[in-house]
Amino acid sequence: VRIVKGANLSMENVQSEVHDWPLATYTNKLDVDANYYRLLDFILREEYADSVRIGVATHNLYTAAMAYELGKKRGVLHMMDSEMLQGMSPAQQAAVRKVFDGRQILYTPVVHADDFDVAVSYLVRRLEETAAPQNFLPALFAPKTADHDPIKEQEKVFRWAVDNRWDVHNGPNRTQNRNDEQGRQVAADSAA
């Protein structure tokens, strides 16, 4: 099971607006991060170690370190892998792979040549997500100034999310009853 966050927020925002639905996802990154840490805290346990393998999908070094330390403390390192997008921050990939004792999966889109646009849109989403100023990788390479330290800001966000992981909303933000839906697809299915 890959634990991942943030992949399609733009698409979720569009669907929410177009259909006048509540946003299905969390509305801010702090809550997303806190929920991610809650999931790791919940699943990285001995009682699940024989049943599931966890992919800790992140380029955030704080997150990778937290997952590793939690797995080490609980004796479940064998149930987890680091997962990162191939080609994105190779030096950080190598450092995390070393800490995870080589247990790392690098993923990349693979598509038929006729579907190349799908791979491009995937990579654009990843670049958009990874380059967002509130995310870890831009902070890693951003210059430190006298009044602003991007890595210290990331540490502050990380600590808040860990401290609040059990306090953020847990459950759906939107429900959907497909029996109540209207539209072209529903009409086509009913006619069949």
Label each PLM-derived region with a short phrase:
Residues 191-192:
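C-terminal accessory/binding modules appended to enzymatic or scaffolding proteins
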Residues 188:
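Tryptophan-rich aromatic "cage" segments
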